[in-house]
Design a protein with these regions (language model features):
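Residue-level signal for inorganic ion chemistry
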Residues: 39, 171, 283
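Structural signal for hydrophobic packing residues in well-ordered secondary-structure cores
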Residues: 29, 36, 60, 64, ...
Length: 340
């Protein structure tokens, strides 16, 4: 982790003229790096961001914001009113991933917890949310210090459960834009390993894709591994489904139209000599266009059904395709805002 990452991210949220934001960022960097290391070493899974939210709330209050906690799960909202002017929203995510850290960093996470399914999992900030939160707090500190240089209302949002495509929806359902000032513009960032440190990228138009989560329950007829002819093996069927799904993007989606179909989880069986009754697949889908999203989902349903039929599955054993209602739309950056 290089301090310049934090500095570059912080300056993205600042567009001030009379003062020197860079000098304030440099002043704040030592304490921000300490905060980053603390957050990195203590990650929490989606919907369990208790201590993380408490740390961010404490930092926002120290910067002079009025903070509301436990808003939409472990979400939080900080408000700094500074006279008449536009309302600007700055957002960070809070949650981490069930990933084992192997960086060897002195502040590496050693966290291991039970997930919502009761499984023991390692936890790591592997998607940069620790950097996002640190930049977020630095932005709050600097904007608070420079209140004589701007007018308006600053809304700072800590979004829980971003990795599960759930937290933003929970905050909206809780009345985010009816209980707090509605923003004229929203600013956020995402760190990227594709960019050199010390650089900031701004994308006009589509920047981040739709996100859909799809579960597939592949059913079978269990039995003994020595007598597979007496059952219907869902592991074999699930394997055929995973391979067939790879044709959607490569052979059905127009080249140049971004799309992703990834099978990220497959679970089934308990012992080497037992054919299970069921295998579960978990997929993530990404796209920009509504018609592409629709095509991906329809193709998954078609392929799953066809593979099951070719395996001789009876109607009552057809796989279930479950598309989550918590779909996240694509992020579209207004070109006129990007050029300011």
């Amino acid at each position: 982790m290089k301090p310049i990452h934090l500095a570059a991210s912080l300056l993205l949220c600042l567009h001030l003229q009379a003062a020197d934001p860079a000098a304030l960022v440099k002043e704040q960097l030592p304490s921000l790096v300490t905060l980053y290391q603390q957050l990195h070493a203590n990650p929490e899974l989606s919907m369990h961001e208790v201590e993380t939210a408490a740390v961010i709330a404490r930092e926002l209050r120290a910067a002079g914001l009025e903070v509301t906690e436990k808003f939409g799960g472990h979400g939080l909202v900080g408000v700094l009113k500074n006279g008449e002017g536009p309302t600007i929203l700055v957002r960070t995510d809070l949650d981490a991933l069930p990933v084992k850290e192997q960086t060897g960093a002195p502040y590496a996470s050693t966290k291991r917890v039970k997930d919502d399914l009761g499984r023991d999992v390692d936890v790591m900030h592997a998607c940069g949310h620790d950097i996002h939160m640190t930049s977020f707090i630095g932005t709050a500190r600097v904007l608070s210090r420079l209140r004589d240089q701007w007018k308006g209302t600053l809304i700072m949002i800590g979004q829980p459960a971003e990795e599960r495509v759930l937290g933003a929806r929970l905050m909206l359902r809780a009345g985010l834009f009816s209980k707090f000032p509605r923003p004229d513009m929203a600013l956020a960032l995402h760190c990227s390993s594709d960019m050199a440190h010390g650089t900031v990228g701004i994308v006009e138009g589509y920047a981040l894709a739709n996100v859909d989560s799809v579960d597939i329950v592949v059913k079978g007829v269990g039995g003994h591994g020595s007598m597979p002819h007496l059952g219907k093996d869902p592991i074999v069927l699930a394997s055929h489904i995973v391979l067939a799904l790879q044709n959607i993007v490569s052979r059905e989606v127009r080249p140049g139209d971004p799309a992703v179909v990834t099978v990220g989880s497959i679970h089934g069986g308990t012992k080497s000599n037992i054919i299970p009754d069921e295998v579960r697949l978990q997929l993530t889908l990404r796209s920009y266009k509504t018609e592409t999203r629709r095509h991906l989902i329809e193709s998954i349903r078609r392929i799953v059904k066809a593979q099951a039929e070719s395996a001789g599955m009876p109607v009552e054993k057809m796989p279930e395709v479950i598309v989550s209602d918590d779909q996240s739309p694509a992020l579209y950056n207004q070109p006129e805002l990007c050029t300011k």
